[in-house]
Each structure stands twice: as structure tokens, then as C-alpha cells.
Design a protein with these regions (language model features):
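Flexible, glycine-rich beta-alpha linker
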Residues: 1-4
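Anionic-ligand binding region
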Residues: 9
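C-terminal substrate-binding subdomain of Rossmann-fold SDR/epimerase-dehydratase oxidoreductases
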Residues: 13-17, 21-143
């Protein structure tokens, strides 16, 4: 998916040379796709752990994410006002107590997206954005 904060902003930097940040103070929890896959494997291999667990390890503001990207991609950051102050924070201490440890961080994801885009493996297609895909298939109207 390219419509979650880290992926979306990284692709903006790579394809437009500019990151547009709406607000910037909103917090988002982050987890690398490899780590979320490892969470599932961890519970399959450790069935004694049951219940509901949060899986998110880096609660970072959108503005901080943009700065992290700008440290790896030659881009400018444009901050625009936003009327959406929603922030989401996740505490994953319960998950960590089961012995699970994440292996990757947001900076790893930025670097991987950058490398995949520059090598031609990743392209900026509508099918990687949920709302664009749903509108294309007449499941949602963006207007």
C-alpha cells in the first residue's frame, strides 16, 4: 500500500520532489510489513499466547516522518494547514512481553521504498492506493 503515511510521503518525495504535509503534528504508529508478518508467525509458533495485541512500535508525527524522508531523498517539504488533528498512538508492551522483537524501523522502510522505486521494481500505480482502487472499480466515489 502506498496510502499509509510513510509510504505515501516517500512516494511523493520520489515522484514529485516535494512532500506535502497536512498539519504535521498528528501522530501515527508504524510497523514494517516484514515485522507484521513476523508477528503472525510469532503467534503461530507460540500458541500459548492468546488474546488481543497491539502491533506498532514507532509513534511518530507526520512532520517527523517527512523530515526522515528528506534526510534520504532530495526533496522539499511543504506544510499546509489541516483541520484533521487526529492522532493515533499504540502501546505494544503486551506484545513485546511475549518475546516478540521488531527487526525493522521507519527508516528501513523509507530506504527500501527508495531503492525499489529507483531500481524500477516499484511504480506509483493507482492500484497501490485503496481509495483510488475502490473508485476505479466503482466501489467508492471520491467526488
Amino acid at each position: 500500500r502506498l496510502d499509509v503515511a510513510v509510504n505515501l510521503l516517500t512516494m511523493q518525495a520520489l515522484t514529485k520532489g516535494k512532500i506535502t504535509v497536512l498539519g504535521g503534528s498528528q501522530i501515527r504508529p508504524n510497523i514494517h510489513m516484514d515485522d507484521i508478518t513476523d508477528v503472525y508467525l510469532h503467534f503461530i509458533e507460540n500458541p500459548q499466547h492468546t488474546g488481543i495485541y497491539n502491533a506498532g512500535f514507532e509513534n511518530i508525527s507526520i512532520g517527523e516522518i517527512a523530515l526522515m524522508i528528506a534526510n534520504k531523498v532530495d526533496t522539499e517539504i511543504e506544510i499546509q494547514e489541516s483541520n484533521d488533528p487526529r492522532s493515533y498512538r499504540v502501546n505494544s508492551d503486551k506484545l513485546l512481553a511475549t518475546g516478540f522483537k521488531p527487526k525493522k524501523c521507519v527508516e528501513d522502510a523509507i530506504e527500501e521504498i527508495k531503492n525499489h522505486y529507483e531500481s524500477g521494481v516499484l511504480t506509483d500505480l493507482d492500484e497501490y492506493y485503496n481509495l483510488k482502487w475502490m473508485e476505479k472499480h466503482k466501489l467508492y466515489n471520491l467526488d
